[in-house]
UniProtKB/Swiss-Prot annotation:
InterPro entries: Asn/Gln-tRNA_amidoTrfase_suB/E, Asn/Gln-tRNA_Trfase_suB/E_cat, Asn/Gln_amidotransferase, Asn/Gln_tRNA_amidoTrase-B-like, GatB, GatB_C_1, GatB_Yqey_C_2, Gln-tRNA_amidoTrfase_suB_CS
Enzyme Commission number, as recorded: 6.3.5.-
Family: Belongs to the GatB/GatE family. GatB subfamily.
Pfam family, one: GatB_N
Domain of life: Bacteria
Keyword field: ATP-binding, Ligase, Nucleotide-binding, Protein biosynthesis
Protein name: Aspartyl/glutamyl-tRNA(Asn/Gln) amidotransferase subunit B
The protein's assembly and partners: Heterotrimer of A, B and C subunits.
Gene behind this protein: gatB
Organism (species): Pseudomonas syringae pv. tomato (strain ATCC BAA-871 / DC3000)
């Protein structure tokens, strides 16, 4: 039987506010346990929550970025459940009236197409604390520094049909929240976490299958692996005559399997009701328009502009627009070099490889956009060849200065003098007289292969400095003359 996969995602983004959503406690990551939790965060009697206006602004900003309805009358509710790191015995969240309603996001796929994924809603809520199991010899420690940190939970429609589509969607959300400056997107620190709802159904069936939720997956790679593992588990289960049970599961990267955590709760299991300590939030038109005015050019618009303005492919434009820092770097390189396609290739391939090797982001690149742009200009004006450029790039990465300084210091300037190149070619052909005779006696097909040998010898003789185009033209004339 052929199966269709149905995936919906819930993404929890920690908002980059200075203080918590309902208290004045700081939100700095990595502080000593329980040093950033006040009486409100601890759920002590007699204290009242006060809503952080900046968290509201950030939620509205996200809603506008995904063409969503803004809930101008939204309400906080208590989500009741017991967990050791939830001091109040309930979490303040939103249920019936969220701050962000229906929207959508267009995501670029690997095959160059773009898919629209619906966004059901996004709501504000407070994060819980953290349970620490490692250092307490059979006991569990509780760190409440994270309790009360503002979260925006973004819920998608079940529109994705493969793990790769799900990863593309998470990457698109990740890019948007970073562009907007509302979340740092650091998945290793838990700033962005993903719950994956996965079900399968026979191809052509309209009704959804029974879904399972994989909780708190915190990397793009693990999202893909967890979903694929769960898909296979469900297929094997049904094809062996079993039945999928609705449940919450955890992904174990060591075994590449999901395992049952608990039965999946429904909304009414949490006994939601409006929080009596918080008034409904009324958002005025003027607040929405003020926030709209602060929106930057976002990845989808930037991707389209890169395609139309620079003639880039959908894939290249998507990669370059995936982070604000990378897009800015690329545009700076283009403005200096004047060649967008060459700039795209160097930023994505050579620079990308260097950054991966050094384990740094583009804003910490050892080669600045000015340096790279200057070097590419020297390729386009034939001062250096593409091969020599790699040596120059490496030298710049090692702190040897600008491209011009490296070229001058190392004597790497490309030879473009036709007379000098001809003289060098005469020496190469004289040293390989036997091969020259074989070339002249060969048919067209064999000549093509042999020609590469002479080009290689010529470039070796010039130490890579001869202009490759001139070498090709002059060599062809000499061999066939």
């Amino acid at each position: 039987m052929q199966w269709e996969v149905v995936i919906g995602l819930e993404i929890h983004t920690q908002l980059s506010t200075q203080s918590k959503i309902f208290s004045g406690s700081a939100t700095t990551f990595g502080s000593e346990p329980n040093t950033q939790a006040c009486l409100v965060d601890l759920g002590m009697p007699g204290v009242l929550p006060v809503l952080n206006k900046e968290a509201v602004r950030m939620a509205v900003k996200f809603g506008l970025a995904v063409d969503a309805e803004i809930g101008q009358h939204n309400v906080f509710a208590r989500k009741n459940y017991f967990y050791p790191d939830l001091p109040k015995g309930y979490q303040i969240s939103q249920m019936e009236l969220p701050i962000v309603g229906k929207g959508h996001l267009d995501i670029p796929l690997e095959d160059g197409t773009v898919k629209r994924v619906g966004i059901t809603r996004a709501h504000l809520e407070e994060d819980a604390g953290k349970s620490l199991h490692e250092d307490f010899q059979g006991m569990t420690g509780i760190d409440l520094n994270r309790a009360g940190t503002p979260l925006l939970e973004i819920v998608s429609e079940p529109d994705m049909r493969s793990a790769k589509e799900a990863v593309a969607y998470v990457k698109a959300i990740h890019a948007i929240v970073r562009y907007l400056g509302i979340c740092d997107g650091n998945m290793a620190e838990g700033s962005l976490r993903c719950d994956c709802n996965v079900s399968i159904r026979p191809k052509g069936q309209v009704e959804f299958g029974t879904r399972c939720e994989i909780k708190n997956v915190n990397s793009f790679r693990f999202i893909e692996k967890a979903i694929n593992s769960e898909i296979q588990r469900q297929i094997d289960l049904i094809e062996d005559g079993g039945k999928v049970i609705q449940q919450t599961r955890l992904y174990d990267p060591n075994t590449n399997e999901t395992r049952a955590m608990r039965s999946k709760e429904e909304a009414n299991d949490y006994r939601y009701f409006p929080d009596p300590d918080l008034l409904p939030v009324i958002i005025e038109d003027s607040f929405i328009e003020e926030t709209r005015a602060t929106l930057p050019e976002l990845p989808p618009q930037k991707r389209e502009r890169f395609q139309s303005q620079f003639g880039l492919s959908t894939y290249d434009a998507s990669v370059l627009a995936s982070s604000r820092e990378q897009a800015d770097y690329f545009e700076k390189v283009v403005s200096i070099s004047g060649d967008a396609k060459l700039a795209a290739n160097w930023v994505m391939v050579e620079l990308g490889s260097l950054l991966n090797k050094q384990g740094v982001e583009i804003d910490q690149s050892p080669v600045s956009a000015e340096q790279l742009g200057g070097m590419l200009k020297r390729i386009t004006d034939n001062t250096i060849s593409g091969k020599i450029a790699k040596m120059v790039f490496e030298a710049m990465a090692n702190g040897e200065g600008s491209a011009d300084e490296v070229i001058e210091k190392r004597g790497l300037k490309q030879v473009t003098d036709s007379g000098a190149i001809e003289s060098m070619l005469d020496e190469v052909l004289a040293a390989n007289a036997e091969q020259v005779e074989q070339y002249r006696a060969a048919d067209e097909a064999k000549r093509g292969k042999m020609f590469g040998f002479f080009v290689g010898q010529a470039m070796k003789a010039s130490k890579g400095k001869a202009n490759p185009q001139q070498v090709n033209e002059l060599l062809k004339a000499k061999l066939e003359g």
